[in-house]
């Protein structure tokens, strides 16, 4: 069995929706609890992983790239990084925009449009073909990286309310004191099995002055993104970021007042949630850095988000069909889709 059937009361509503909650919708009730399942075989199954149980390659090997934990035919991918030393090379991702979410630590990013320092809770946007490197300030850092082949941009439902970009959006700034240095490796990151590496005579991130107003590299803290609440019954969260094609959406899924979400069949989007941390628990997610994934078409309910103690989490929705990599599967568990606990069959 899976999850916990709600206590006495009316049967939970079951929704089937297209385009997230923006398209066609069907609502029904049923006498049984739809998210329950006895077992599952195959890759299209709900899973969860505590990221602290996975050691990224770049933690102990400065030359390594971040470790991929999920991939897709469409090119949407997830990685984790835990560097303890600076990158000894520069990367230019020529296939995808990247969003780096800093879970732990403080990280300095140097790019060929400027530098910024990001702290725990910050999202850092590095668009396609912007060269960069990063390093922890201190002994440790941990980040989750989302790759999107389509361009990413801030896309709140209204110009004001969810975001205060004038106050909270911070852009990379040129460091005029960065030395030009000597020979530097530039890794062009592509979908090929082997990356292309140029050796340059100087550091490509050493800049002179800015001549344009536009700065494509920015940071925004999760705590600065407002939650969208519907009282008393509750309703879907509002996106703060989207790809230009609508294939990738990101939401603040932190604690908010309102009713528990309905039982849901999301016809078009895989749902990946990162539980950042408490003090409150989000259902079965109590360990910071717990990552959950419910593939499209899998019936789920999900925990209540009305947690008085408070917690932080974010949601990634993607039309891409994600598949966990072997390294991620080694630390992942089958998940029930009621409270997002490990499925009971895991302990048998």
What are these regions (language model features)?
Residues 1-348:
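Jelly-roll (double-stranded beta-helix
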